Amino acid sequence: VIYCGSMGDWPLLSDEERQEGVARLVKARIPTVVGTGAINTKKATDHASHAQKVGALGLMVIPRVLSRGPSLSAQRSHFASILNAAPNLPAVIYNSHYYGFSTRADLFFDLKKEFTNLVGFKEFGGAKDLTYAAEHITSQDKKTSLMIGVDTTVFHGYVNCGAVGAITGVGNAFPKEVLHLIDLCKKAANGDSLARQKAKELDEAL
């Protein structure tokens, strides 16, 4: 479960409610990756440290969303604080220019030098940004995983960019169809022409 991701209505929950949800999921033995989106860095780091304390499996880390969006130094400090708050949890940095800030390769690798728990990059900016991430981030470091974040770029991400996972909104409504699409995309990436045709059709339909 990706809990309290960007589309997970976390602004509607109190901090206590969010953390109670994490604890309940972990207690129920459901693998849980925790979104750390918050209105300030202090709250984001609190969610990260709580996730590690109760036994979550990982973190999703997004930029500051309400202030100092374009500031590189502010965003680096924000990312670093979250990664430092849960050093034992693998973390994926989430890029989306909709937050007013684009995470690029220089910042990502600067953080990765300091934080070994930074293991992945999720791209939500669309096909062009996904291509950028593949060319300048994940292809430069084989230990960094590329995750797809836009429903309409699943085929492009797997087949053209070497993505290893997809975190989608449509998957909540059509889980079987999205899993089937991903299976077809993996086969297409390995050269299966029939799977490629079917994957493109299903990708466009969804």
Model-predicted segments: where are they?
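Catalytic alpha/beta core domains of metabolic enzymes, predominantly
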Residues: 81-87, 96-206
